[in-house]
Amino acid sequence: MSARSAKFMYRSGNAGASGDLSVEYGTDLGALTRLEDKIRLLSDDLESEREMRQRIEREKAELQIQVMSLSERLEEAEGSSESVVEMNKKRDSELAKLRKLLEDVHLESEETAHHLRQKHQAAIQEMQDQLDQVQKAKNKSDKEKQKFQAEVFELLAQLETANKEKLTAMKTVEKLEYTVHELNIKIEEINRTVIELTSQKTRLSQENTELIKEVHEHKMQLDNANHLKQQLAQQLEDTKHRLEEEERKRASLENHAHTLEVELESLKVQLDEESEARLELERQLTKANGDAASWKSKYEAELQAHADEVEELRRKMAQKISEYEEQLEALLNKCSSLAKQKSRLQSEVEVLIMDLEKATTHAQQLEKRVAQLEKLNLDLKNKLEEVTMLMEQAQKEARAKAAELQKLQHEYEKLRDQRDALARENKKLTDDLAECKSQLNDAHRRIHEQEIEIKRLENEREELSAAYKEAETLRKQEEAKNQRLTAELAQVRHDYEKRLAQKEEEIEALRKQYQIEIEQLNMRLAEAEAKLKTEIARLKKKYQAQITELELSLDAANKANIDLQKTIKKQALQITELQAHYDEVHRQLQQAVDQLGVTQRRCQALQAELEEQRIALEQANRAKRQAEQLHEEAVARVNELTTINVNLASAKSKLESEFAALQNDYDEVHKELRISDERVQKLTIELKSTKDLLVEEQERLVKMETVKKSLEQEVRTLHVRIEEVEANALAGGKRVIAKLESRIRDVEIEVEEERRRHAETEKMLRKKDHRLKELLVQNEEDHKQIQLLQEMVDKMNEKVKVYKRQMQETREGMSQQNLTRVRRFQRELEAAEDRADQAESNLSFIRAKHRSWVTTSQVPGGTRQVFVTQEEQSNY
């Protein structure tokens, strides 16, 4: 396997047949684990966002409580102002000028209230428009979220398919390397066989030339014999009749001797052939031993049996060779004895005239031998032609295999280059995916933090609304107190008019005390209303002028002044409490503003990260397109490799190991595909869970919107109450209301900003949903591609079965050829043994049957007599 980095290199069978589809199914199963880790990070980010929203909701509830407390305090302030108004009504008769001034102030407050109402209505309208915009933005964010989810699913599917294709391509590259190595080995073996055939051819040609030389020598001997025949024809006529029988016997003996010589020569040739066959068998044995060592795991039993057969043949051949050597020694001894007899006979023939018939018969025998030698020569030529044909066929096959090997080497180099390129691209894609996923995790985390901040701000808004309500209640209480004070002042003024005459002396002391108390009140009011000092100073001057005018009529109002002092002390205490409460509310609002600034900065950072994620997603899409193009090229290469495999059918007998390896690789590919399918199913389940979480978050957003609407309704009711209170409030209360309204506006602005940020987060969520949907679509496409690859694997399995069948057939054919060769060698050996036995039997038979002696004697008178004694033994 190639880089069982699940580099799933599809090489001629998805692990050997994807033509170098180096899509790292690397083995890159690490990519799937990375995706799972990133999905876990996304779920963690969702949980953190939920926590942010919960915190914002809590802060919103706290703000609502604060607004309620403020409204209650305002109501209390209105009650206290009503008591003050009642006191002022009692004193209206004495303080006409003061009433006019109060009416002027009331008109001014009404005008300010009218302006405030208009502003408030405009603000409410703006808030309604903003709410509509927020709703639209929420819908857009939902859509974008769905798109983002689809994109996430598509990316996951693309990653899985890319890894699978890479693994298959790596496998195919390794398979092709293995096949090329085996083909090189086979080509080396073929070259060895070609060299052996050429050596056999040269040897046979040498033997042929030697045989031709021998034929020429025999022809020369024939010519010499014919010449001798012509010379001795006249001399042999007299002795011809006597020596016919003896010459026939001698001729038969010589024929036997010559046949023995020919047989000896044939036996020598056969021994040479057998020695060569022995060498070939030894070579085959060495080859078989090498093959047994290399293919021991698969063909150990067959090779062992073959080795045993070869060893038995070797033993037989050794025995036969030893027997032949012994027979040769015996024949050589016989030949030496025959040669001695022949030399003796030739000397006798030279002496005797009767040798002429022997020469004639010898010539006839030589002609027969020449005919036999010519027949042998023709047979040898036929054998040579057959051997040359076989050699040419072997050379053609070797050339074709060499060309195929060159093609395979070229294809292998291309596939290796493509594998390296695919590995580099796969690394780049994995790095880009890792960066994208890290960016996605950061974005989810930031979105979660933003949602938490939104929840916290909503809780703060609720607390501020509660504080606002409390302030309204306090304001109402203060207004009631002011009304009571005005009523008491009116009563005091009426008493002053009745008691002017009686209490002129006490007026100065009362005036001093009253002035001191008014100064204390003014000081406390200045502390409570820092922004309204100018108006309080103006009122103070007016009250001082009125008091100077009424100094003569305030002697009788000592008791009323004491009561007023008590009420003023109470009011001062209430004002101090209100001031402290206002300071706390202001501090909380400042904290809310700071938190809003932090959330704004976070939103900006999230937007920048989203843009980076979009860029990364575009890069991932580009990488996906490149991977698809590479996949198509790899499919084309797979087709080319299949054609190459068809062309390599001639070498079926030696490719069984390749097909077995291919089958194992196919099984591994099936297993890896199953594992990848299980992982895809797990990822789909996790994506479904993330979808459910997103749906829950959307439901929570809907709930938040309902809460916002309810809060807006509460704000409207509070505004209505404020308007009612403003109609009856005094200048101080109206100023307090104006302050509170300004603070409420600030809070509303902050809430609007938070809504805007929330809308942006919803947009981001919609984009993520869209991306997730796209990723799901990609996952489906990858499943389809996996099915196509499975079909390709099935087709390649069928091809492997066909190849195996062909391999078995070729193996059977080769085994039959080997058997026929062995049988032919055995037959030839048996024939040689039979011939040797026949020669021995003939020699022994001739020796036993025919024994002759030639003697010569010199007769007086110069005549020479030759006596031939012949002994024949016949066995009946």
Curated annotation (Swiss-Prot):
Gene3D superfamilies: 1.20.5.340, 1.20.5.370, Vasodilator-stimulated phosphoprotein (1.20.5.1160). One of its GO terms (cellular component) is myosin complex. It is found in: Cytoplasm, Myofibril. Transmembrane segments: none annotated. Residues 1-28, 856-876 are annotated as: Nonhelical region. Homodimer. Belongs to the paramyosin family. This is Paramyosin. It comes from Sarcoptes scabiei. The lineage of its organism: Eukaryota, Metazoa, Ecdysozoa, Arthropoda, Chelicerata.
